[in-house]
Amino acid sequence: MTGRQALSLGHKGARVTNSTANGVNAVVILVVEDELFLRVDITGCLREAGYVVVEAASGEEAMAVCQSNSSIDMVFTDITLMGSLNGWDVAERFRMQRPDAPVLYASADAIDRERCAPGSVFIAKPYRPDDILTACQGLRPR
């Protein structure tokens, strides 16, 4: 079965798009980005590549999505987010549920690279779609 289906998760702004390629379910990525235009670009790029994408516009929303969706395989999070939870908080809490799950951090501040947890990847803003796909493919869960 090939197709796409948008489902509401009951969280303001949260959305999951389910896409399948050749009958095989894709990796589910939670994208946490508070800047709408960046989030649209990131999720569009990942969806076109066949990933299943769950979106969140804040750290708090990301945590609510994680609690209601246990199928998330990896997280792509901006480090600087609006609200009380930043990208570090999102990754730490996500890894409490899924210790071996990969995390891709994004930031315009290169010094943030040094703080990334082992097994994570850092991508510097601004980035190109190819940078996103390369990073996600390198982190792809087993």
Where are these regions (language model features)?
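Acidic, metal-coordinating helix/loop segments flanking the phosphotransfer/catalytic sites
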Residues: E55-M74
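Non-catalytic signal-transmission and effector/linker regions of two-component phosphorelay proteins
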Residues: M1-L30, L36-F37, D100, V121-A124, ...
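Two-component/phosphorelay signaling modules centered on CheY-like receiver
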Residues: L36-V54
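Active-site residues of response regulator receiver
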Residues: D78-I79
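Short loop/helix-cap segments at secondary-structure boundaries that form the rim of catalytic
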Residues: N69, A110-S120
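Acidic catalytic/metal-coordinating carboxylates
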Residues: S58, L85-V90
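Short amphipathic alpha-helix used as the core "switch/output" element in two-component signaling
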Residues: W88-P99
